[in-house]
Amino acid sequence: MARTPWLPNAYPPARRSDHVDIYKSALRGDVRVQDPYQWLEEYTDETDKWTTAQEVFTRTYLDKNPDLPRLEKAFQACNDYPKSYAPYLHDDNRWYWYYNSGLEPQTALYRSKDSSLPDLSTADGSGGDLFFDPNALSNDGTAALSTYAFSDCGKYFAYGISFSGSDFVTIYVRLTDSPLTKDVDAKNDKGRLPEEIKFVKFSSIGWTPDSKGFFYQRYPDTSTVTQENGPIATEGDLDAMVYYHRLGTPQSEDTLIYQDKEHRDWMFSIDVTDDGNYLLLYILKDSSRQNLLWIAAFDPANLGPNIKWQKVFDEYHSEYEIITNKGSLFYVRTNESAPQYRVITVDIAKGNEINELIPETDAYLSSITSVNKGYFALVYKRNVKDEVYVYSHAGNQLARLAEDFVGAAHVSGREKHSSFFVELNGFTSPGTIGRYKFTDPEEQRWSIYRTTKLNGLNTEDFEASQVWYESKDGTSIPMFIVRHKSTKFDGTAPVIQYGYGGFSISIDPFFSATILTFLQKYGVVFALPNIRGGGEFGEDWHLAGCREKKGNCFDDFIAATQYLVKNKYAAPDKVTINGGSNGGLLVSACVNRAPEGTFGCAVADVGVHDLLKFHKFTIGKAWTSDYGNPDDPNDFDFIFPISPLQNIPKDKVFPPMLLLTADHDDRVVPMHSFKLAAELQYSLPHNPNPLLIRIDKKAGHGAGKSTQQKIKESADKWGFVAQSLGLVWKDSTEQPNL
């Protein structure tokens, strides 16, 4: 199709105030920074009118795309296939697993009729009975199951529900013999207990061994908690507390276990060891890979603020994760003196004596699970490709599983069980579940339990490869490239380039029927550079993209585009960059930083665009470990020059740009996208390409979105790319060029 016509200088107006913030700079003293759209940080009638006008304006442009209806229909069709996830045997001796028949708004929790392993290879893939259906909680699919935990006795099911994508969760409890389905009358739900635990955020649910109650993290009782149909809470997250809730009592009687009034922005996680003998308290000050770890003997008669904690690791310099324990001997995954991670033991009965069990290797130890009362299932990441191994508790390697698989692996298992499952996914692999059963003969222990079958999409028509390229400073960066086999690498193909690069998060090969369909329909190539700042190669790789080195992330991403064009994977003017959250920052910063004409289009999802104020909202203070603290004069000097909002060049042409946010995003609050959109439209009113913002309703940062919301958003987002670049819909019957 032809590019959608664009008339510059027609944006909805936004009032510019004379608001100025003063920051301290180590190099320049007081620095005055104008913030004319500071008023967009608050939910007022003026903000509502501006966002409504922007929604109408953007919708008008998107709806001019003649391909939009069939693109949405194609995305709906390609996602309409049964999706099952690895089953998990709980203490009621029944198997539980997530299942979605295809287009249900939220994935539901199913369970087996008895202790027999369910058959998930049946035609519909459900393999059992519906146990918990989040779709019964709302008419529009915006209530989501965020977390859950079964009691050790198997009688109770505690579950956290979030509404409209908020990070805030309310915990409820129901009897496991009373499933929640759409047939249950919500007003007369006899299976749900009176429990209603509010103000919960970033929390697990940790049942005590006696099944009389559970631990959780909450924030103070305030009126600013994000509500389902109201404005979001934007204040900074302060005063987290760990509580114990006893079943049958009101939340007001819950017992405070721990809080730190001197460090109001610290967060906590509490758990009980599998043997029921110890409490584990993790204390985090930010998003870095560092935490404190305290351990205490579990005493049901002494659950309160006077618990005597043994401060096993009490300095912030490394990450410590308990894998399992044998009495007082604890097995720990850590990056202490090991950027790629290793396994150590610490004996708390012997003065916290430490010994190395599994040394650091040249691959990143991304996860380790204790299984079968004496074994570990490890996932190593080597060049962004997962490898799964079985080790003994003595630290000896026994087997490698699925050696020919290229992609990402996730292990699901428990120490008390004689088998575990591995979920395998890749760019052209929609989902395979393997099972390792210790009780079988050694050569028969590994088998394929379930393979996902698609409807209307042949993954054999696509191929994925990995290349390496040099960044600006000479660092070698890996990049995956995916294409439909009919798409040629001759310098004419449009490319979607996706990135993240932050918080030690590895962006592994993943399956997306939506992306593959877009590649097929428009002859597009998908590229994923694994830039610095992520966790693909351990902690050193992460730190190479943090704080004063954050610019490395942007340089890596820009160099990826230049490599794609130079080597004819991409047409010079048709590379679209995309990323979400920290990846949204990546997109807006790179558009500012790259030479004019580097990108053909840019799409930034829920991005962190105001690096001078991110730390003042919700969980933002925790991100200072990656971004730096704008209130620190030394940090300000490396943050200010890269913050997208304050560094829009007014003398260069911007590519078509779409910012996406949501009205209930209380992780990266929407003010980031609001202010950047307003500033872009003011600073570049005559830009020959559109600079738009899409604002989702009753949605948050991403988690909990309904299937329908995801499909609609994908159609708008990728449709914007197609209409902005003038992409042509290909005949779907075209045969691959083998």
Curated annotation (Swiss-Prot):
One of its GO terms (molecular function) is serine-type endopeptidase activity. SUPFAM superfamilies: alpha/beta-Hydrolases, Peptidase/esterase 'gauge' domain. Its EC number is 3.4.21.26. It catalyses: Hydrolysis of Pro-|-Xaa >> Ala-|-Xaa in oligopeptides. The active site is at 581 (charge relay system), 665 (charge relay system), 701 (charge relay system). InterPro entries: AB_hydrolase_fold, Pept_S9_AS, Pept_S9A_N, Peptidase_S9_cat, Peptidase_S9A, Prolyl_oligopep/macrocyclase. Keywords: Hydrolase, Protease, Serine protease. Pfam families: Peptidase_S9 (PF00326), Peptidase_S9_N (PF02897). GO terms for cellular component: cytosol. GO terms for biological process: proteolysis. Monomer. Belongs to the peptidase S9A family. PANTHER family: PROLYL ENDOPEPTIDASE (PTHR42881:SF2). Housekeeping prolyl oligopeptidase (POP) that behaves like a conventional POP by cleaving peptide bonds on the C-terminal side of prolyl residues within peptides that are up to approximately 30 amino acids long. This is Prolyl oligopeptidase A. It comes from Galerina marginata (strain CBS 339.88). The lineage of its organism: Eukaryota, Fungi, Dikarya, Basidiomycota, Agaricomycotina.
